[in-house]
Amino acid sequence: MSNKPQSKRGTVTRHTHPQRSFVKRVYVAVLLVLLPLLMSLFSVLSKRARNETQYLRSGFTLKIAITGWNRTKTVRCSSKSWISDKKATPTLTIGFRDLDYAFDVFSGSITLQDALAARYFTTHGPNDKGVAVTYLFNVILKTFFGWRKSYRR
């Protein structure tokens, strides 16, 4: 047995400094508010995002939830845009295990695929729709965070 201290990474119940936690909450909250606008904008500007939006089709509803935090975001795909719709029943739910994990993904410090492999979040819904949402999010995240090490592969 090694006497090396175990890494705290991956521990869901870890605590962060209160000020950093506040900044993370604000950052993630702002991105959740902007999510329908960003998804609509990229569905117009990016051919790949447009193809994924067309694949998902009108009526598809995505819900993003973060365990331990009372904010969720539900967006519905209409013919050419994404709109916020709290009352819609989600087709696919992405559930982050905690705020730190959501922040890591939304700040570009880890890719969506790596976060899924590390179980930062779970998905509930049809796999084909989950893959399409992953591609759509990758277009958005890579545009903003292409300069980050995790997206320079």
Where are these regions (language model features)?
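Feature captures hydrophobic
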Residues: 1-153
